[in-house]
């Protein structure tokens, strides 16, 4: 068995994301990684930005996480059942320009739930596509990201 190519894994994930509707994906973003949807939409694919500072293997893990968000949101009815507080707050914010729900502790906790679930969905997608995931590196990076989300959401209180 030869060396595993995370570059090829990134290409495979990019192709998968393109097929899902993301036609603007970059891997050299100079700010935090994120996924974005079409304006005034909460789940129609638009673009994905991955931080450029990481090695290719970690970029694969970040892209899996961002695509985990896609997996959660692509069926909005299902997303609403899994994360009703986030779905309601974002719907009211984006469609009625009302931010009161986004200021609530329940929303903050629900956002954290989505982050955890996005990592789970990303891992499942990686397994489905046959992407090799080093569990030590995956869990270390995931933990680093989750603690940073906790600090971010905690600072908004």
Write out the residue ranges for each language-model feature.
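Active-site scaffold of zinc-dependent metalloenzymes
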Residues: 3-9, 14-59, 67-74, 79-80
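A broadly tuned preference for mixed-charge, low-complexity surface segments
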Residues: 36-41, 80-87, 116-119, 123
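Long, well-structured alpha-helical subdomains associated
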Residues: 55-58, 100-157
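General N-terminal targeting signals
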Residues: 67, 79-80, 85-87, 150, ...
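Post-HEXXH active-site segment of zinc metalloproteases
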Residues: 73-114, 139
């Amino acid at each position: 068995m030869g060396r595993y190519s995370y570059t090829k894994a990134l290409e495979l994930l990019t192709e998968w994301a393109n097929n899902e509707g993301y036609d603007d994906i970059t891997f050299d973003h100079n700010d935090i990684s994120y996924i974005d949807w079409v304006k005034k939409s909460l789940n129609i694919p638009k673009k994905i930005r991955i931080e450029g500072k990481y090695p290719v293997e970690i970029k694969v893990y970040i892209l899996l996480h961002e695509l985990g968000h896609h997996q959660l949101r692509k069926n909005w009815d299902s997303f609403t059942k899994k994360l009703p507080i986030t779905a309601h707050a974002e719907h009211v914010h984006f469609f009625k320009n009302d931010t009161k729900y986004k200021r609530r502790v329940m929303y903050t906790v629900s956002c954290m739930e989505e982050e955890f679930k996005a990592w789970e969905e990303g891992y499942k997608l990686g397994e489905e596509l046959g992407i090799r995931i080093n569990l030590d590196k995956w869990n270390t990076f995931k933990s680093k990201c989750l603690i940073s989300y906790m600090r971010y959401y905690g600072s908004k209180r």
